[in-house]
């Protein structure tokens, strides 16, 4: 079953690192997807699910950094699969080992306890440009390496694919690939500045101007705004 763009999109930042977590569904009372459950968001996710009578069909991860995946196991709760690109799958084994020591120390100081990681039980590995139908939502996986090897964006089309003239993307969950006025870092382990440039040129810039961008950090934006004002997109060409 393929639906039009979702009508229920709830986003909120985690207390740590202000990582945006999103809950997306076609409507209240239906299945949903949870995107990037970061540090300490599990209770907030449960509240959203209860308030809107939602049932999680999948947990989608834009990449494997700790601030985007830390609550994936409690949110999945042994009943829901976590989806991550195959190139970032190794990070779910122990994301604590793939981050800067300073980031880990900052997190432990903020929460006053040692970070503990549990790998999710059911993990589905994604490929680039893969199509998914989860919670009745048509999703496209856009592989956009640079911030990490397996960074992806999740695109939701405005109308179902297969309809004439329907290859228009209305909403993109951009993770740490694209922010309002900026892009994700490439100096962390697994980052690659050249790969990021290629992703921006070949994956991000072709998105239609009307695309709503829901980033991993900071406010929502549009491709029209970013194309005109984001300094990291200037000079790359369409």
Positions of predicted regions on the chain:
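Conserved beta-strand hairpin/beta-sheet module of binuclear metal-dependent hydrolase folds
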Residues: 2-52, 154-166, 170-173
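Short Pro/Gly-enriched beta-strand edge/turn motifs at strand-loop
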Residues: 2-8, 110-114, 135-139
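Short Gly/Pro-enriched turn/cap motifs at secondary-structure boundaries
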Residues: 12-14, 121-123, 143-145
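Short acidic/glycine-enriched loop/turn segments that link adjacent beta-strands
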Residues: 16-18, 126, 148-150
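Conserved S/T- and glycine-rich ATP-binding loop of Class I adenylate-forming
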Residues: 24, 62, 144
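Metallo-beta-lactamase
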Residues: 30, 40, 98-102, 137-237
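Hydrophobic residues in well-ordered beta-strands that form the structural core
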Residues: 35, 83-84, 174, 215
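Active-site HxH/HxHxD metal-binding segment of metal-dependent hydrolases
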Residues: 39-43, 47-133, 159-162, 228-236
């Amino acid at each position: 079953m393929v639906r039009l763009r979702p009508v229920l999109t709830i986003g909120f930042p985690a207390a740590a690192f202000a990582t945006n977590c999103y809950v997306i569904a076609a409507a209240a009372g239906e299945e949903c997807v949870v995107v990037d459950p970061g540090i300490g968001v599990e209770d907030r996710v449960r509240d959203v699910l209860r308030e809107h009578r939602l049932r999680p069909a999948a947990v989608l991860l834009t990449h494997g950094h700790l601030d985007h995946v830390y609550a994936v196991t409690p949110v999945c709760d042994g009943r829901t699969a976590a989806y991550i690109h195959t190139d970032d799958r190794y990070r779910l084994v122990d994301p604590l080992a793939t981050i800067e020591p300073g980031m880990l120390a900052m997190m432990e100081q903020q929460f006053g306890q040692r970070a503990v990681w549990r790998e999710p039980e059911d993990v589905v590995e994604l490929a680039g440009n893969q199509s998914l139908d989860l919670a009745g939502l048509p999703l496209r996986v856009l592989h956009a390496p640079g911030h990490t090897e397996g960074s992806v964006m999740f695109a939701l089309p405005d109308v179902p694919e297969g309809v004439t003239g329907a290859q228009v993307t209305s909403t993109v969950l951009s993770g740490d690939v694209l922010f309002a006025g900026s892009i994700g870092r490439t100096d962390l382990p697994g980052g690659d500045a050249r790969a990021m440039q290629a992703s921006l040129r070949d994956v991000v810039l072709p998105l239609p101007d009307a695309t709503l961008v829901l980033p991993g950090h900071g406010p929502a934006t549009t491709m029209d705004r970013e194309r005109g004002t984001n300094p990291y997109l200037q000079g790359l060409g369409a």
